[in-house]
Curated annotation (Swiss-Prot):
It comes from Pseudarthrobacter chlorophenolicus (strain ATCC 700700 / DSM 12829 / CIP 107037 / JCM 12360 / KCTC 9906 / NCIMB 13794 / A6). PANTHER family: UPF0102 PROTEIN YRAN. GO terms for molecular function: nucleic acid binding. This is UPF0102 protein Achl_2213. It comes from the Bacteria. Belongs to the UPF0102 family.
Amino acid sequence: MKAKDLLGRHGEDLAVGYLETLGMLIVERNWRCSEGEIDVVALDGDALVIAEVKTRRSLDYGHPFEAVGPDKLARLHRLGAAWCRDRELRMPLRRVDVIAVVDDGGGSPVVEHLKGVAEWRSDAPILWRSWA
């Protein structure tokens, strides 16, 4: 496995552990379809959480949150809908959370969580939030 892939997997492991400490139930990891991949699918109460995890060794090339823009959020929305269709589930509330992990390998990794960057109900339009 490439170093980049190992770092990404490590970041996802840390993110999953973090989400579990918040009481979320991890339903699936690394779900793929023709549209792309969801890093983590979780349940937070009655909300289905589509979690995007971005991991970096440093901030030299920007904060991990900067790698998740409107196009990526729209794709995650579509992926969440595809995941539900694949399982014949109707989740009234879905949201996208973004988790940033910075781990330079020399100390404690830093995990940051943006909850509800985008969310939608089955009967309402998508609500986009800006974290900038």
